[in-house]
Amino acid sequence: RPNDNIGLTIFAGEAFTQCPLTVDHGVLLNLFNGIKGDIAQRGLIEDGTAIGMGVANAISRLKDSKAKSKVIILLTDGSNNRGDISPLTAAEIAKQFGIRVYTIGVGTNGTAPYPMQTYAGVQYVNVPVEIDEQTLTQIAGTTNGNYYRATSNSKLKEVYEEIDKLEKTKLNVKEFSKREEAYQLYALIAFICILLEIVLRNTVLKKIP
C-alpha cells in the first residue's frame, strides 16, 4: 500500500509524534528504527504506559483529514497507568471524528525484560507484564474496530494482513501527459497512525520467538 499516508506515535508515560503522516515510507521506517527502548530511562520521556494519551496524539493528527478511511492501530504490551486522558475517553473522541481504532495486545502475560538505568548503565531486568485486554476490546468496540492478540512475530504479521484486508478503499487514479512524460495522481486513501509503546522493541519483541 505505497499510497497510504502513515504516521507514527510512540508513548510511554506520555506520547509524542515520532513521524507525521507521510507517503514516504522510507523516512517512516528510518524514524521507526531510530526508536530506543531505554528512552524513558534516559529521561527523554516520562516512564509508564499512557494509552489514552497515545490515542489522543494520533487523533490530533487525523481529526481534520477528509480521507474516507481514518485508522489508528494501537500496539501495546501493557495496561494504562499514566496520562491525563483515559483510554476509553480517547476512544469516544476517536468515534466522534470517525476514526476507527484497531487494538493489538502483543506478547504474553508474565514477565518481560525491561531496560533500567543503573550505576553501570542501562541493564535489563524482568518485570511483570499484564495486558489489559478488556480495555483494548472496549476501545476497539467503541470505534467499530477490532481487538487482536499477537503472541509471536508471525501472529503479529497475520494481524496486520487482516487489518489490511478490512481497510480497503477504492482508489481513482488519473493519468495525464505533458511533454511526453506520464504522471500518476494518487488519491489519499487511508490515514493510518501506528501507536507503538516505546519499550516494545527491547521488551516484548525480545521475548517473542
Residue map of PLM features:
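C-terminal signal-anchor/stop-transfer transmembrane helix together with its immediate cytosolic
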Residues: 169-209
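Solvent-exposed loop/turn segments at secondary-structure junctions
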Residues: 13-17, 38, 78-81, 107-111, ...
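Membrane-embedded segments
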Residues: 1-69, 85
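Short, hinge-like loop/turn segments at secondary-structure boundaries
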Residues: 24-27, 119-122, 165-168
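Juxtamembrane amphipathic/hinge helix adjacent to a transmembrane helix
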Residues: 146, 150-183
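A structural signal for isolated positions on well-ordered beta-strands in alpha/beta enzyme cores
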Residues: 7-9, 71-73, 100-102, 148
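Sec/Tat-exported extracytoplasmic proteins
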Residues: 1-4, 32-39, 55-66, 76, ...
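VWA/integrin I-like adhesion module and closely mimicked acidic/polar interface patches used
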Residues: 42-46, 60, 69-71, 78-142
